[in-house]
Structure formats: C-alpha cells, structure tokens
Amino acid sequence: MQWQGRSVRKSTGGRYSPSRGKRRREIGSAPAETHIGIDRRKISRTYGGNNKVRALRCEYAAISNAKTGETKKVKIETVEENAANPNYVRRNLLTRGAIIRTELGRARITSRPGQHGVINAVLIE
C-alpha cells in the first residue's frame, strides 16, 4: 500500500514536520495489473463504504464500431501497443489507452479495467 500524500521535503530541501500520522482513507492500493485470461475480478471497499470492482484477468472486451454503431463481445488475442509503459506489451497488461488485437481487428481500450472491472474498446481498424 502506498500513501498518496504531500511530499516530506520542501522545495528548499528541508523537511516538513508531520502534524499527524497517516489515515486509512489516505492509503492507496496496489495497481490491479489486468492480464489476459479467464475472468477474475476482485471487489474492494472504498471510501464512503462504496465498492470498486477490479478486473484481475479478462478474456473478452466489448468493442464498439463507430461506423456501424454496434457493440460486440469479442475475445482478446494480445496487447500490441501501450503508451503507458513498453513493458506492459511484453507482459500483456490491459490498461486504458492500450491497443489490443482481437478477432475483429485492432481496438483501443477506453475503460479503466482496474477501476471499472470491465474492458470497453473502440475499433480502430
């Protein structure tokens, strides 16, 4: 877990003296790192008692075709390009903005699998 807070150092290099310790609500969570595989999801409690569905593995994506206006559930074959990190292509990690190869062709992921629990994509070829 990582604390998503202010830096301990000032711009001059000095240290801020903490007025209090960390709170549970201020601690972030580890990235979901969604892979290609048989569907596996995890439900985690978030701030305010709400739930967040994290996709750990996904096999299918809902791909929309802008020309015809229809959406189909299509199997994901592989990750071809990922602007977030070149290593994600080798590891076949699914993130928002990644370009995936499917049975219909190439598509760009528009949803956030680690936050939404589903993979929505737009056909680009």
From Swiss-Prot:
GO terms for biological process: translation. The keyword Cytoplasm does not apply. GO terms for molecular function: structural constituent of ribosome. Keywords: Ribonucleoprotein, Ribosomal protein. It comes from the Archaea. The keyword Iron-sulfur does not apply. Belongs to the eukaryotic ribosomal protein eS8 family. NCBIfam families: eS8. This is Small ribosomal subunit protein eS8.
